[in-house]
Regions:
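An N-terminal, well-structured beta->alpha segment
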Residues: 1-62, 66-68, 144-166
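N-terminal small/polar loop signature for handling phosphorylated ligands or for N-terminal nucleophile
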Residues: 37, 42-106, 182-243
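Active-site nucleophile and cofactor-binding loops and adjacent substrate-binding regions
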Residues: 71-80, 249-252, 274-275, 296
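Glycine-rich phosphate-binding loop
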Residues: 92-100, 104-106, 222-244, 249, ...
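Gly/Ser/Thr-enriched, mixed-charge loops and adjacent short helices
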Residues: 105-225
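Phosphate-binding and adjacent anionic-ligand microenvironments
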Residues: 265-423, 428-448
Length: 448
């Protein structure tokens, strides 16, 4: 078994290379052992539309049943429907088989104990159980239950649009296609849907809305029909991408500004959490609207647990994970987030660009990934942090964000790749270039 499949936020690898039926059965046994030690036995299993997911369901369930778990199989569904089932069916945990937004040859597993997603050391504990080879034994069971209709009804009862909205959605042949078009039409929207048929080969484009290339068809259709908004979902519908009528991509931190204003209107002083990669505009706007913005570590599991700790009503990431604890359960759900966006649009005659038109103009880079071996990346970031700490104010909850009066630069170690991640923002293109050069030159000096 390749230990590298146990990642920071989930378990994932290449089908038949890292993930075999035997490895998946062991995962099922390890999960059963881990959760039984906590006195929990009633769990859920769901899966995405990847070609290998039905196959992996068999050994996963066998392993879990051999450990005495009572399983409800909810079939093919988006990841947020799996999270919803933990509340709706009142289960004590579960496993979602999903490769999320990774290429077709990948698959993976998101693991929940109680209502929480495992991350970090807890995921490594599953690996340690497999390596020790001592598994819980018992006589489990499997039953089947359809949860998608209950999920759709829940959202329809909790979302209210003031007028009909014309929009385009692109499910990227992922699982959102089985759920989102119906909800949006039942809300009264005029929906043009692209690639709603689930197909694990992803024949039209890769299901990752953070990459502009994958949004081209959505942008073209929004412009062609004159839609108010375009919404793209990733492969398992826990991340959202948004396009405005002129065809600009609204990144996660801008989207969070719209959601934050709405939440703060109803809950003055609320706490809102985002990550170190986000624009200064977001934190300034939260403060301007009377909220408490917390800059936290990147990574959806880390953000979710920080939200619980701070009793935050809203959280979000650049990557499009949006977490609503306001009127919802606090997990990342791109379908629910799109409904909340439509609520905002339905209550105004302003367009998306007009709603964001009062933000100060800034210039930023996308995330820049610089290859750096896993065994060196944390030490390098630490040295960069110590070097800048002497001269500039910094934020160091995750790597180092160096603060300037008119911009910032971020250097952090990637949680998922052998790389360091850089991002820069400034008030002018010239200043952006200067900040970037200053920080990149410092990294070069330190890594000599």
């Amino acid at each position: 078994m390749n230990p590298a499949i146990f990642r920071e936020y989930d378990i994932r690898g290449i089908v038949d290379q890292d993930l075999t039926d035997e490895v998946v059965r062991l995962l099922g046994q390890a999960f059963a052992t881990y959760i039984s030690r906590q006195g929990k036995h009633r769990v859920v299993v769901g899966r995405d539309g990847r070609l290998s997911s039905p196959r992996f369901r068999e050994p996963l369930v066998q392993g879990m049943v051999s450990g005495g778990l009572e399983i409800v199989d909810i079939g093919v569904c988006p990841t947020p429907v799996f999270y919803f089932s933990l509340f709706h069916l009142d289960r004590e945990g579960g496993v979602m088989i999903t490769g999320s937004h990774n290429p077709p040859e990948f698959n993976g597993f998101k693991v929940c104990v109680g209502k929480e997603t495992l991350f970090g050391e807890e995921i490594q504990n599953l690996r340690k159980i497999i390596e020790a080879g001592k598994f819980a034994e018992g006589k489990g069971s499997v039953s089947f239950q359809e949860v998608i209709p209950a999920y759709q009804n829940y959202i329809l009862q909790n979302i209210h649009l003031d007028r009909r909205i014309k929009l385009v959605i692109d499910s990227g042949n992922g699982t959102a296609g089985a759920v989102a078009p119906k909800i949006l039409r039942d809300l009264g929207c005029r929906v043009e849907d692209l690639y709603s048929k689930i197909d694990g080969r992803f024949p039209n484009h890769h299901p990752d809305p953070t990459i502009p290339e994958n949004m081209k068809d959505l942008i073209a259709k929004v412009q062609e029909i004159g839609a108010e908004v375009g919404i793209g979902y990733d492969g398992d519908a826990d991340r959202i991408g948004v396009v405005d009528p002129p065809g600009n991509i609204i990144w996660g931190d801008q989207l969070l500004i719209l959601f934050a204003r709405e939440v703060l209107r109803n809950h003055p002083g609320a706490t809102i959490i985002s990550e170190v990669k986000c624009s200064q505009n977001l934190y300034d706007d939260i403060a301007r609207h009377g909220g408490r913005g917390i800059m936290w570590k990147a990574g959806h599991s880390l953000l979710k647990s920080k939200m619980k700790e701070e009793k935050a009503l809203l959280g979000g990431e650049m990557s499009g994970h949006m977490f609503f604890a306001d009127r919802y359960f606090g997990y990342d759900d791109a379908i629910y987030a799109s409904c909340r966006l439509l609520e905002i649009l339905s209550r105004t005659e302003k367009t998306l660009p007009e709603l964001l038109g009062d933000l100060p103009k800034t210039f930023s880079t996308p995330e820049i990934r610089v290859p750096c071996p896993d065994e060196e990346k944390f030490e390098l970031v630490e040295k960069v942090r110590e070097s800048f700490r002497k001269e500039y104010p910094i934020v160091d909850v995750d790597g180092v964000r160096v603060l300037f009066p008119d911009g910032w630069g971020l250097v952090r170690a990637s949680n998922t790749q052998p790389a360091i991640v850089l991002r820069f923002e400034a008030r002018t293109p010239e200043r952006l270039k200067e900040i970037r050069q200053l920080i990149e030159n410092r990294i070069k000096e330190i890594s000599k």
